A protein has these predicted regions:
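Gly/Ser-rich "nucleophile elbow"/oxyanion-hole loop immediately N-terminal to the catalytic nucleophile
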Residues: 37-73, 83-89, 129
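Mobile cap/lid helix-loop segments that gate and shape the active-site cleft of serine hydrolases
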Residues: 7, 14, 87-133
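Short beta-strand immediately N-terminal to the catalytic nucleophile in serine-hydrolase-like folds
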Residues: 4, 68-70, 95, 138
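Conserved alpha/beta-hydrolase "acid-adjacent" motif
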Residues: 145-150
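Gly/Ala-rich beta-loop-alpha elbow adjacent to hydrolase catalytic centers
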Residues: 69-78, 143
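Alpha/beta-hydrolase-fold serine-hydrolase catalytic core, especially in secreted/extracellular enzymes
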Residues: 156, 160-216
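Active-site machinery of serine-nucleophile hydrolases
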Residues: 1-58
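Short beta-strand/loop motif that positions the catalytic acidic residue
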Residues: 130, 136-139, 143
Length: 216
């Protein structure tokens, strides 16, 4: 199963139509609530996980072959959900994903109550949770919506942590791109090499060591 999170202004149906038909996986693309879906944080994160649980209960799916991806806001959601629930996904594959709100917007939530409430949303504080996972990062080098610096920073941060890390930066590509328009599937979300990794990777059921941060 591939859980795919849409970007702002996109719904699940549009997201699903960006994928080619696959004989080895279901593509589950939920539509989040409200125009920006809480950036797949808080209630948005709950929506994603509840959709996953429904799919697992409805279809005959191997829970060791569940993967997570998304584009733009959904790429951020992939980072956030991935570092928060690393035990659920074999491959974590953000495309054009921003890291977190402070880095993306320049906001500073400080260390008071507001900052403590936002602590679980700081992706970089939890990246070590991805150590045993397969991570596949996709970004266009000419993306003027989510700068490629986000992907490059995550690659640099994860290189000493994640053994199975792939970084694909498409030269000259913008925010949404397809290098092979005559072939089914949109490459920025349905890149063949990434799909081959998902098809082959199985989630290791061994217990994980992971990091949590208390808001107190």
């Amino acid at each position: 199963l591939i859980l795919s999170l849409h970007g702002a202004g996109v719904n699940g149906l549009g997201q699903a139509r960006s994928y080619s038909t696959k004989d080895w996986a279901w593509v589950v693309a939920p539509t989040n609530r409200r125009p920006f879906g809480y950036d797949w944080e808080t209630f948005g994160r709950m929506d994603a996980l509840e959709s996953l649980e429904y799919a697992l209960a409805t279809f005959d799916i191997d829970p060791q072959r569940v993967h997570l991806t998304g584009h733009s806001m959904g790429g951020h959601g992939t980072w956030h959900v991935g570092v928060s629930y690393p035990h659920r996904f074999g491959v974590i594959a953000p495309s054009a994903g921003w890291i977190d709100r402070e880095i993306y917007t320049g906001a500073n939530f400080g260390t008071g109550p507001w900052g403590r409430a936002k602590a679980p949303l700081k992706t970089l504080d939890f990246v070590e949770n991805l150590a045993p996972r397969t991570v596949y990062i996709i970004h266009g080098s000419a993306d003027n919506n989510v700068p490629p610096s986000h992907a490059r920073q995550m690659e640099q941060t994860l290189t000493p942590i994640v053994a199975d890390l792939t970084y694909h930066e498409e030269a000259g590509a913008g925010h949404w791109w397809d290098a092979s328009p005559d072939v089914p599937g949109t490459d920025c979300v349905d890149l063949p090499d990434m799909m081959q990794r998902m098809e082959s990777v199985r989630l290791d059921p061994a217990p994980l060591a992971f990091r949590v941060i208390s808001a107190g």
